[in-house]
A protein has these predicted regions:
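Residue-level marker of positions within ordered structural domains that often coincide
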Residues: 18, 48, 82
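Solvent-exposed alpha-helical segments within well-ordered globular domains of core cellular machineries
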Residues: 11, 31-34, 55-59, 79, ...
Length: 107
């Protein structure tokens, strides 16, 4: 994925964070991925996240049919949403999740 698309995704993630529409942390992400009330979901994972974490999240995404995107590193991902050291972020806002999916599909 090129730098421009990554920046666009990180910007959308920043919008979601400012609107308090992000899920992060193991328990919050588990709940988010299995929540049937949210129809459009996307999970953004840092490339340098632990292999065990990535495997667990990928399996959960496959089970719940949620798009799984790997971009940037933990530091960049965390900075985009105003946190420190994040491995994965779920987008709770359906419009922003759909916008991120469209950016990825435009490859």
């Amino acid at each position: 994925m090129d730098e421009q698309k990554i920046n666009k995704i990180l910007t959308y993630m920043g919008f979601a964070a400012r609107a308090n529409k992000i899920a992060f942390g193991k328990d919050m992400l588990k709940e988010y991925l299995s929540d049937k009330r949210i129809s459009k979901k996307v999970l953004v994972v840092a490339k340098d996240a632990g292999e065990r974490v990535k495997k667990d999240l990928r399996i959960r995404c496959d089970i719940n049919k949620v798009p799984y995107i790997e971009i940037a590193d933990k530091k960049t991902l965390a900075k985009a949403v105003g946190k420190t050291n994040l491995s994965a972020v779920g987008i709770l806002d359906e419009n922003l999740a759909e916008a991120i999916i469209k950016v990825v599909q435009a490859e």
